[in-house]
């Protein structure tokens, strides 16, 4: 017999006779093990909870009602801007810091690192510069709502770069944030996009699109544009990097580079009275006695200590004798040896020559920076061969511990050589690798209001050779560019010092050393003659809102349109008219709560009038310059049915207004009259009051109609 499902329902016990067993929660199912494992006793599974016999009551949905303006417009702000570009030897510069100043033809521009923010104010400034397009106007719409954005990054042909973004407040911009724009630091962070060049990924997409929502703490509600315009919607950073040669330049033997600077014992000083050589003699070149013109070189072993005495400024003959004596005993030896013992020379040296020859004694180098020992005076007439102290550096040996990078200003001294101001340090970073500290250091100092002519880069590091013990950075040809050359044939009869430096090194002089250290770091661009370009496209989605219908252009007679010479196209680009969000005052608009029984309240009218009277000059952003200079009439407002919410431009003083004022006086006087005594008098009083109110409503309607006719001439066709 074939089994079939019974069509009738099986019999069940009555409700009062049903037997209920204790309900237990079903155990969770588990997968069958796929491999053998060591068996162990599991903890017994416990069942929690109870079975409900009655269905749980459905919770009512709580409806949160939010104000929605009656007039709304969707707006998409789309723009295409340069993200990064830099010229030769500008890899460590900040893009926006090196872009605003007008450059000569041979000067470089841009930078290899950058950061920025997007806000409604920034987007409006870009609109004024012509970098983006707004799909809808925000005139007469003071409310704004933000829905997110899309960022499109385009792949470059030869350059690779990194883009990092965040929409999580708090947003901050400080020195640590700027040094974090180094490529190695950017690769280690999250929320980044690595855009490799087309040479490395020839078959990849040409662009990458990122969808970014509103900030994490921003509520999806309506804001006043005046309060919302300065809110940061997105913060980002970008930098170029070198994925092909990240650690050592192509063709180089090692990671060591050389930069130049001045040691701490030869600080120059700016002064109104002395040149650098006189400061060097009276304050810094110590170990020279005043007892005699003859001083042994043995006394120079402990030079520049606080116990030594100061000496006078040496003349030209003494310098020449010192040169010959130095060349005759140019034999390297340990620091503690009796160096050049017994050689008596007149050494009251106080100029650049001392700074040059001191390198041999303290660093065991060649006694003359331009060649072998025994250099003649003729060889010294070529300052282009002079160079400051050289320091070797490698990023692979820099551990960061004990490093110090800052900017310092020069102490000024009085006419007696006494220091009047201490050496000030600012923008200091400690215990970090030098290749990381120098990122955008020059532009950060300029952004903090530091004058580059009065400040210098200060470095202390144990990972250079020789050790950079409180040095001032300079470039290699600093001496050749800043030495006042002798214009006389005989240097002995010169009025000024042949080797006098007329200024101390500043931030601009230290940029070469900063660039060398930055390019030595990992993943930084290594080629000196390299350049780069990167492009970004963005689309921000907004909604404008308000209680008044925004203005729309009215059709005009085509036969009365103006005529232009040349091609038949209008002189304007057809962009939407945009108001500055920071100028949209909500007090200058009427709102639904400003009406009482179909009429505007006096306080609302007074508020709007005061707000409009406060604006003495029209906003520069209402209409762009040249929009109404071609004979076109200004856009007229469309007819609105119902009660108007526009402030009247004139105060009519006709019969209706006089009647309304008289009625206001009589109504106040009637309130003080006595109450009718008989029912007949009461009925007459009510009838007169009804007639007055009817007449009052008619006069108010005619008065409002006249005001609307003055504001909108189109209504004359509807109300003759």
From Swiss-Prot:
This is Capsid protein. Belongs to the anelloviridae capsid protein family. Residues 546-569, 616-691 are annotated as: Disordered. Residues 652-664 have a biased composition (Acidic residues). Keywords: Capsid protein, T=1 icosahedral capsid protein, Virion. InterPro entries: TTvirus_Unk. Pfam families: TT_ORF1. Self-assembles to form an icosahedral capsid with a T=1 symmetry, about 30 nm in diameter, and consisting of 60 capsid proteins. The capsid encapsulates the genomic DNA. Capsid protein is involved in attachment and entry into the host cell. It is found in: Virion. Its main location: virion. One of its GO terms (cellular component) is T=1 icosahedral viral capsid.
């Amino acid at each position: 017999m074939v089994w079939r499902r019974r069509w009738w329902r099986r019999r069940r016990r009555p409700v009062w006779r049903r037997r209920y067993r204790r309900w237990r929660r079903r155990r969770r199912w588990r997968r069958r093990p796929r491999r053998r494992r060591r068996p162990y006793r599991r903890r017994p599974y416990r069942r929690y909870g109870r079975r409900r016999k009655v269905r749980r009551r459905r919770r009512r949905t709580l409806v949160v009602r939010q104000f929605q303006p009656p007039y709304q417009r969707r707006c998409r702000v789309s723009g295409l801007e340069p993200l990064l570009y830099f010229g030769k030897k500008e890899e460590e510069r900040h893009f926006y810091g090196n872009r605003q100043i007008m450059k000569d033809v041979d000067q470089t521009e841009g930078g290899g690192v950058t950061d920025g923010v997007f806000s409604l104010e920034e987007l409006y400034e870009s609109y004024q510069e012509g970098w983006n397009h707004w799909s809808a106007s925000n005139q007469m719409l003071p409310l704004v709502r933000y829905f997110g954005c899309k960022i499109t990054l385009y792949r470059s042909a030869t350059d690779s770069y990194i883009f990092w973004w965040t929409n999580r407040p708090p947003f901050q911009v400080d020195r640590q944030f700027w040094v974090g724009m180094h490529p190695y630091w950017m690769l280690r962070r999250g929320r980044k996009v690595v855009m490799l060049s087309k040479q490395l990924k020839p078959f990849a997409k040409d662009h990458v699109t990122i969808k970014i929502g509103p900030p994490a703490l921003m509520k999806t509600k309506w804001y006043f544009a005046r309060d919302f315009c300065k809110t940061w919607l997105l913060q980002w950073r970008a930098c170029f990097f070198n994925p092909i040669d990240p650690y050592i330049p192509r063709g180089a033997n090692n990671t060591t580079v050389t930069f130049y600077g001045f040691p701490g014992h030869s600080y120059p000083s700016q002064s109104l009275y002395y040149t650098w050589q006189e400061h060097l003699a009276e304050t810094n070149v110590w170990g020279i006695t005043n007892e005699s013109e003859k001083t042994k070189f043995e006394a120079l072993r402990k030079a520049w200590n606080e116990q030594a005495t100061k000496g006078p400024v040496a003349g030209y003959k003494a310098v020449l004798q010192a040169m010959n004596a130095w060349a005759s005993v140019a034999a390297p030896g340990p620091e503690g040896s009796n160096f050049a013992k017994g050689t008596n020379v007149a050494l009251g040296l106080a100029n650049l020559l001392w700074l040059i020859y001191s390198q041999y004694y303290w660093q065991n180098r060649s006694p003359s920076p331009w060649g072998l020992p025994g250099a003649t005076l003729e060889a010294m007439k070529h300052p282009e061969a002079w160079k400051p102290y050289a320091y070797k550096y490698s990023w692979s040996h820099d551990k960061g511990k004990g490093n110090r990078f800052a900017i310092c200003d020069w102490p000024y001294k009085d006419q007696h050589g006494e220091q009047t101001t201490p050496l000030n340090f600012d923008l200091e970073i400690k215990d970090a690798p030098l290749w990381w500290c120098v990122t955008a250091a020059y532009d950060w100092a300029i952004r903090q209001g530091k004058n580059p002519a009065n400040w210098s880069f200060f470095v202390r590091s144990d990972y250079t050779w020789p050790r950079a013990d409180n040095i001032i950075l300079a470039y290699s040809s600093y001496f050749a560019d800043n030495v006042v050359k002798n214009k006389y044939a005989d240097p002995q009869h010169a009025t000024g010092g042949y080797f006098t430096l007329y200024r101390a090194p500043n931030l601009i002089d230290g940029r070469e050393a900063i660039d060398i250290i930055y390019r030595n770091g990992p993943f930084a661009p290594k080629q000196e003659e390299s350049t780069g370009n990167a492009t970004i496209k963005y689309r921000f989605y907004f909604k404008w809102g308000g209680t008044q219908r925004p203005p729309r252009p009215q059709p005009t007679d085509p036969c009365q349109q103006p005529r232009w010479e040349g091609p038949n196209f209008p002189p304007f680009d057809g962009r939407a008219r945009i108001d500055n969000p920071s100028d949209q005052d909500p007090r200058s608009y009427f709102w639904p709560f400003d009406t009482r029984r179909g009429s505007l309240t006096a306080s609302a009218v007074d508020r709007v009038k005061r707000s409009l009277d406060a604006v003495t000059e029209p906003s520069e952003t209402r209409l762009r310059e040249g929009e109404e200079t071609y004979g076109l009439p200004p856009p007229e407002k469309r007819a609105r049915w119902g009660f108007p919410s526009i402030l009247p431009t004139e105060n009519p003083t006709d019969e209706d207004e006089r009647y309304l004022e008289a009625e206001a006086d009589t109504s106040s006087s009637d309130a003080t009259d006595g109450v009718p005594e008989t029912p007949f008098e009461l009925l007459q009083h009510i009838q007169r009051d009804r007639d007055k109110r009817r007449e009052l409503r008619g006069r108010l309607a005619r008065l409002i109609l006249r005001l609307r006719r003055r504001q909108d001439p189109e209504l004359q066709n509807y109300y003759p």
